[in-house]
Curated annotation (Swiss-Prot):
Compartment list: Cytoplasm
Gene: dapB
Enzyme Commission number, as recorded: 1.17.1.8
Binding partners and assembly: Homotetramer.
PROSITE patterns: DAPB
GO molecular function terms noted in the UniProt entry: 4-hydroxy-tetrahydrodipicolinate reductase; NAD binding; NADP binding; oxidoreductase activity, acting on CH or CH2 groups, NAD or NADP as acceptor
NCBIfam families assigned: dapB
Source organism of the structure: Yersinia enterocolitica serotype O:8 / biotype 1B (strain NCTC 13174 / 8081)
Family: Belongs to the DapB family.
Lineage, broadest ranks: Bacteria, Pseudomonadati, Pseudomonadota, Gammaproteobacteria, Enterobacterales
Pathway given in the UniProt record: Amino-acid biosynthesis; L-lysine biosynthesis via DAP pathway; (S)-tetrahydrodipicolinate from L-aspartate: step 4/4
Example of a GO biological process term: diaminopimelate biosynthetic process
Name listed for the protein in its UniProt record: 4-hydroxy-tetrahydrodipicolinate reductase
Amino acids binding NADP(+): R39
Length: 273
């Protein structure tokens, strides 16, 4: 990217996260909203993106086709759903546009497609764009190295009633951070939502529990429990703006990377700690 001002496009512009992303872009120096996209047939198509997000008139009409606005942005921010994100990925790859991906729930094939595209374009792909959550992931790596071999590890997450995937991408990222520190594969040691006569807890496993209720933005706790004591590392989000601001920060950071697959820990230089 050669422009001093980074042009950002937002897909899913009319959703809760999309509106917050537009707000974050308008409040951040060095970036502008270049395009806003909604699904074909949406009643929001043609409306002004700024008025939609409550930031005032921006003179950017919401489009129903990302491929028609590729000349208007440098980086795409996508917090939609896996099938839509993969369609957007193909368009960005064809037009050499960077991507910030906050969509969760990808299967292995979807993750492989993202990895393959990163050979040609810059991608920041993260389960959570909160600075706090990514600090927590680093703390979990450290805690697991000290306590992980002898404690019972459980991850509990809670989100609003509208979230469609479980466990959350952040909960899985927490589990992966712990498992990797212990030299394990999360696929081999994860236990999801126990029910019925489960028998005693198996050593070396990582348990997951999920809550879906009300308007909870996002709460995650990792527990390292031993006999006589336990350590809990918790993050609670109270506003989606923390994710939106992190995504915009990632878009700015990507301006210095023509290709490659990164996560929020790269953006925050946490991998250097």
């Amino acid at each position: 990217m050669t422009n001093s001002t980074i042009r950002i496009a937002v897909v899913g512009a009319g959703g809760r996260m999309g509106r917050q992303l537009i707000q974050a872009i308008t409040q951040t120096k060095g970036v502008v909203l270049g395009a806003a996209v909604e699904r074909a047939g949406s009643t929001l198509v043609g409306s002004d993106a700024g008025e939609l997000a409550g930031t005032g008139l921006l003179n950017i009409a919401v489009s129903d086709d990302l491929s028609k606005v590729t000349d208007h942005f440098d980086v795409l921010i996508d917090f939609t759903r896996p099938e839509g994100t993969l369609e957007h990925l193909a368009i960005c790859r064809a037009h050499h546009k960077a991507m910030v991906i906050g969509t969760t729930g990808f299967d292995d094939a979807g993750k492989a497609a993202i990895s393959a595209a990163s050979a040609e374009i810059g991608i920041v792909f993260a389960a959570n764009f909160s600075v706090g959550v990514n600090v927590v992931l680093k703390l979990l790596e450290k805690a697991a190295k000290v306590m992980g071999d002898y404690t019972d590890i459980e991850i509990i997450e809670a989100h609003h009633r509208y979230k469609v995937d479980a466990p959350s991408g952040t909960a899985l990222a927490m589990g992966e951070a712990i498992a990797e520190s212990l030299g394990r594969s999360l696929k081999d040691c994860a236990v999801y939502t126990r029910e019925g006569h489960t028998g005693e807890r198996k050593p070396g496993t990582i348990g997951f529990a999920t809550v879906r209720a009300g308007d909870i933005v996002g709460e995650h706790t990792a527990m390292f429990a031993d006999i006589g004591e336990r350590v809990e590392i918790t993050h609670k989000a109270t506003s989606r703006m923390t994710f939106a601001n992190g995504a915009v920060k990632s878009a700015i950071w990507l301006s210095n990377h023509d290709n490659g697959l990164f996560d929020m820990r790269d953006v925050l230089s946490l991998n250097e700690l």
